[in-house]
């Protein structure tokens, strides 16, 4: 707490209370700010260097590897596991892995579409009724709903801005006139 200054603040809502001003707010001159900024940057660089430091491949160094224990006396006792539950869990994992790795092309290959008769719907021959809603028309420039149509090339647009852009760059009818 030696890095901070204690200041007494009086507010109308509360009585006297003590607050601490951090070290960075006490810096008053521009030179002190620059020095403090350099210290912070150098501290960050040193911590990054420490994090990224690696031993060269093949050198073991003088220190022993503390992560590796060669003690055969340490035995870890676990609680007994129901073998039937363990077997069921393994089977579930096998089945999940098999089904999760299939993409659509694999599914089509495994479905043997050529073996089905023509009247049976498959992934390729599936059909649906026409929509009861009218078709949507989208702006050829921005993708919003296009309420207007170009008279020259019958492309859709939604606003005057899109129409101007369409006339400048995309209108096929204006090329021939």
Swiss-Prot record:
<dbReference type="GO" id="GO:0000812">
    <property type="term" value="C:Swr1 complex"/>
</dbReference>
<comment type="similarity">
    <text>Belongs to the ZNHIT1 family.</text>
</comment>
<feature type="compositionally biased region" description="Basic and acidic residues">
    <location>
        <begin position="27"/>
        <end position="41"/>
    </location>
</feature>
<feature type="binding site">
    <location>
        <position position="171"/>
    </location>
    <ligand>
        <name>Zn(2+) 2</name>
    </ligand>
</feature>
<feature type="binding site">
    <location>
        <position position="162"/>
    </location>
    <ligand>
        <name>Zn(2+) 1</name>
    </ligand>
</feature>
<dbReference type="InterPro" id="IPR039723">
    <property type="entry name" value="Vps71/ZNHIT1"/>
</dbReference>
<feature type="binding site">
    <location>
        <position position="142"/>
    </location>
    <ligand>
        <name>Zn(2+) 1</name>
    </ligand>
</feature>
<dbReference type="Pfam" id="PF04438">
    <property type="entry name" value="zf-HIT"/>
</dbReference>
<feature type="binding site">
    <location>
        <position position="153"/>
    </location>
    <ligand>
        <name>Zn(2+) 2</name>
    </ligand>
</feature>
<dbReference type="GO" id="GO:0008270">
    <property type="term" value="F:zinc ion binding"/>
</dbReference>
<feature type="region of interest" description="Disordered">
    <location>
        <begin position="1"/>
        <end position="74"/>
    </location>
</feature>
<feature type="compositionally biased region" description="Acidic residues">
    <location>
        <begin position="62"/>
        <end position="74"/>
    </location>
</feature>
<dbReference type="GO" id="GO:0006338">
    <property type="term" value="P:chromatin remodeling"/>
</dbReference>
<feature type="binding site">
    <location>
        <position position="166"/>
    </location>
    <ligand>
        <name>Zn(2+) 2</name>
    </ligand>
</feature>
<dbReference type="GO" id="GO:0031491">
    <property type="term" value="F:nucleosome binding"/>
</dbReference>
<feature type="binding site">
    <location>
        <position position="150"/>
    </location>
    <ligand>
        <name>Zn(2+) 2</name>
    </ligand>
</feature>
<keyword id="KW-0862">Zinc</keyword>
<feature type="binding site">
    <location>
        <position position="158"/>
    </location>
    <ligand>
        <name>Zn(2+) 1</name>
    </ligand>
</feature>
<keyword id="KW-0479">Metal-binding</keyword>
<feature type="compositionally biased region" description="Basic residues">
    <location>
        <begin position="15"/>
        <end position="26"/>
    </location>
</feature>
<protein>
    <recommendedName>
        <fullName>Zinc finger HIT domain-containing protein 1 homolog</fullName>
    </recommendedName>
</protein>
<feature type="binding site">
    <location>
        <position position="139"/>
    </location>
    <ligand>
        <name>Zn(2+) 1</name>
    </ligand>
</feature>
<keyword id="KW-0863">Zinc-finger</keyword>
<feature type="zinc finger region" description="HIT-type">
    <location>
        <begin position="139"/>
        <end position="171"/>
    </location>
</feature>
<dbReference type="InterPro" id="IPR007529">
    <property type="entry name" value="Znf_HIT"/>
</dbReference>
């Amino acid at each position: 707490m030696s890095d901070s200054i204690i200041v007494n603040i009086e507010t109308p809502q509360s009585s006297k209370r003590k607050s601490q001003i951090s070290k960075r707010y006490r810096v008053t001159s521009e030179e002190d700010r620059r020095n403090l900024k350099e210290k912070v940057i150098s501290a960050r660089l040193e911590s990054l260097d420490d994090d990224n430091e690696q031993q060269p491949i093949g050198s073991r160094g003088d220190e022993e590897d503390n992560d590796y224990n060669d003690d055969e006396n340490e035995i870890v006792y676990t609680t007994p596991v129901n073998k039937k539950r363990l077997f069921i869990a393994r089977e579930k994992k096998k089945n999940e892995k098999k089904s999760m790795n299939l993409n659509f092309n694999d599914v089509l290959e495994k479905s043997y579409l050529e073996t089905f008769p023509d009247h049976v719907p498959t992934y390729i021959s599936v059909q649906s009724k026409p929509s009861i809603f009218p078709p949507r028309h989208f702006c050829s420039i921005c993708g919003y709903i296009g309420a207007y149509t170009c008279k020259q090339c019958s492309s859709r647009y939604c606003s005057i801005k899109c129409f101007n852009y369409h006339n400048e760059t995309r209108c096929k009818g204006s090329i021939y006139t």
